[in-house]
């Protein structure tokens, strides 16, 4: 119950507070909106009662699927959740960036994950990421992230939490000057490597990650809703977080990934 109480406060503060206001464009973080003009209907399966796993005070919404069909849905009315609410995926946004990089690989825009990212990005070529491979960006194994001590500072900059126009992904990456190890030696969870991946996608395509994802990956999940995505002051999508979709579409995304893995 202690965890549930903490989780409930987290949902109220983050999902219904700062993050929700950002999604609506009311906070300091700019947001882009991509309208789904051809919404699909997710197939329903035989219902299962999974309340023992998901019916908690702090659980905002939950969708479970089996064989690509919805078998369980729950929307916490006390937290004003509903099927049409576009929920913030938090760090699952990183997964969407990874899928977008995968799309560029499959379509030949990237030759190999073992290429240096700087082969495709002038901004990364002029940074400490000059020699880092795309594979090690995706693995968070650049050797640049020793720990998460400096993460909050960078995250606040990228989200424009200072509200002073310093939310520039490229400048954040260029401000980093030191490594702690050679790339590929160890994976360290951090915002910087996925930020570099977002820059990579933008400089390959001259489009934001959000736009490339929306046009090429999103349709394949048969989405019911639209999507929102945080951007910096150059309309470059944040990689660390900031993607909002309907709960069903987060489930559809997971189902799509499972099918891709097993195909």
Language-model features, listed with the residues they occupy:
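Solvent-exposed, acidic/flexible segments
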Residues: 43, 47, 57-58, 85-93, ...
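Non-transmembrane alpha-helical segments in soluble domains
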Residues: 51-54, 102, 118, 135-138, ...
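Active-site-proximal alpha-helical segments within enzyme catalytic domains
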Residues: 193-200, 239-262
